[in-house]
């Protein structure tokens, strides 16, 4: 119902060399895309969809009349849906490095002597590289300015990078369940996932296709680890609890709990459709993402007293040190105070760097977070909002109450879907209107 129907992917070849951030060059590359809706005469109704880690170009519709699995964002894209294909021309592109048709590790390396796949020789790519190829795609489609660039999770990072790198080429930026950069904890999760693949004996240093093997066990474990971070404790408790698959303990290492069965199923299904080398480079692209890297503010530490108001430093320290404090107590208090000041300084520097990264952007923003998302918590979205507001950018923010954790951005949640639709359909604000329109939709919670 309200589907875009059967869609046919298109493959576009780019003959020009592509220099990547890692200083390596692809001699040529291909991008596979899907489009939905009709581009209007002045090409002002185009919306770009950026996919997440395991996503692809197939965001909506079906590949045949018998296809039972719709695109990964079919509840968002279609006639009269949040991204209305009666109104917009929607483009979803599969990024290079993926395993769903665009040039990646499973593609033939044109520089190999025996027409072998790239495998581990495919260069590491970044969010910035992806956005660069998407801009090249825009040129090929003769779309000068996108009505909006939209993405969830890693797709949201691409939308942010678009705003920073091509400020005049998009009017709206929709960032959903995302973050300005990965935390140490998130990098750690990615490293555990990578090591599960790298340590699989069938990985063969990434040349498993040539060896006729496949690191299936490693990829299964990697997906199991990742999937846990997409869910919430409450959701897992409600769905599985401590339910046993057979109703009794089997006193062995086979699947006993329902949650074990679920995770293994998710891992096995993923391993059948995804490439291990692609998983490795996708997670590294996540780790590398940091739109503030191009700004020296992130490298220059400022004195604490220039970041925290003098009266705050004085009052907080004096009030916490009593006249009869022992030398040890005094030392501890001073140390605790220094820790607090260091945190304040760090937060200030992060905000300053983000402000610098987005100060030159020209688009309007919608930032969406979900209350139960602990992979990219609402606080991370609020960092983006704070930086945008501090630079006077027009930004709307909504923190949606949803039980699905990080995966909430894939669910049909009325308040969330309504916010996206309203934002995309609203008239573009002039500069004068923008100055008076900074708003946050929904309370911070």
UniProtKB/Swiss-Prot annotation:
Subcellular location: Cytoplasm
GO CC, any one term: cytoplasm
Molecular function terms from GO: homoserine O-acetyltransferase activity; homoserine O-succinyltransferase activity
Site annotation Important for acyl-CoA specificity: residues: 375
Catalysed reactions, as listed in the record: L-homoserine + succinyl-CoA = O-succinyl-L-homoserine + CoA
InterPro entries xrefs: AB_hydrolase_1, AB_hydrolase_fold, HAT_MetX-like
EC number of the protein: 2.3.1.46
Pfam families according to UniProt: Abhydrolase_1
The AB hydrolase-1 domain, residue ranges: 45-411
Active site positions: 153 (nucleophile), 373, 406
Major subcellular location class: cytoplasm
Positions contributing to substrate binding: 223, 407
Annotated HAMAP family: MetX_acyltransf
Main function: Transfers a succinyl group from succinyl-CoA to L-homoserine, forming succinyl-L-homoserine.
Family: Belongs to the AB hydrolase superfamily. MetX family.
Assembly information from the UniProt record: Homodimer.
Name the UniProt record assigns to this protein: Homoserine O-succinyltransferase
Protein's organism: Psychrobacter arcticus (strain DSM 17307 / VKM B-2377 / 273-4)
Lineage: Bacteria, Pseudomonadati, Pseudomonadota, Gammaproteobacteria, Moraxellales
């Amino acid at each position: 119902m309200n589907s875009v129907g059967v869609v046919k992917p298109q493959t576009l070849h780019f003959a020009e060399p592509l220099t990547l951030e890692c200083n390596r060059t692809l001699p040529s590359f291909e991008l596979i895309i899907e489009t939905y809706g009709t581009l209007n005469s002045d090409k002002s109704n185009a919306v770009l969809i950026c996919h997440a880690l395991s996503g692809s170009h197939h965001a909506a519709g079906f590949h045949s009349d018998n296809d039972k699995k719709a695109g990964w964002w079919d509840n968002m894209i279609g006639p009269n849906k949040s991204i209305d294909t009666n109104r917009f021309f929607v483009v979803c592109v599969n990024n290079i490095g993926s395993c769903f048709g665009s040039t990646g590790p499973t593609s033939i390396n044109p520089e190999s002597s025996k027409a072998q796949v790239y495998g581990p020789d495919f260069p590491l790519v970044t969010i910035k590289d992806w956005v660069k190829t998407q801009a090249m795609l825009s040129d090929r489609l003769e779309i000068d300015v996108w009505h909006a660039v939209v993405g969830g999770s890693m797709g949201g990072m691409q939308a942010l990078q678009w705003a920073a790198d091509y400020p005049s080429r998009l009017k709206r930026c929709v960032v959903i369940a995302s973050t300005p950069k990965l935390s140490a904890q998130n990098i750690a999760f990615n490293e555990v996932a990578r090591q599960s693949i790298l340590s699989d004996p069938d990985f063969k240093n990434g040349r498993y296709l040539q060896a006729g093997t496949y690191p299936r066990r490693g990829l299964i474990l990697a997906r199991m680890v990742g999937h846990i971070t997409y869910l919430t404790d409450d959701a897992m408790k409600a769905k599985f609890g401590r339910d046993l698959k057979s109703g009794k303990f089997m006193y062995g290492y086979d699947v006993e709990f329902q949650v074990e069965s679920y995770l293994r199923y998710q891992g096995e299904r993923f391993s059948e459709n995804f490439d291990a080398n692609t998983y490795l480079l996708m997670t590294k692209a996540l780790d590398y993402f940091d739109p503030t890297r191009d700004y020296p503010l992130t490298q220059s530490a400022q004195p604490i007293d220039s970041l925290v108001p003098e009266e705050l430093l004085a009052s907080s320290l004096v009030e916490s040190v009593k006249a009869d404090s022992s030398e040890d107590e005094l030392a501890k208090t001073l140390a605790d105070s220094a820790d607090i000041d260091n945190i304040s300084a760090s937060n200030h520097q992060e905000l300053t760097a983000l402000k610098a990264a987005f100060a030159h952007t020209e688009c309007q923003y919608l930032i969406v977070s979900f209350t139960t998302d602990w992979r990219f918590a609402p606080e991370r979205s609020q960092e983006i909002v704070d930086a945008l507001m501090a630079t006077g950018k027009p930004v709307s923010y909504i923190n949606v109450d949803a039980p699905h954790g990080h995966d909430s951005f894939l669910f049909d949640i009325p308040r969330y879907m309504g916010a996206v639709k309203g934002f995309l359909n609203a008239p573009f604000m002039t500069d004068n209107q923008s100055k008076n329109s900074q708003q946050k939709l929904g309370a911070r919670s």
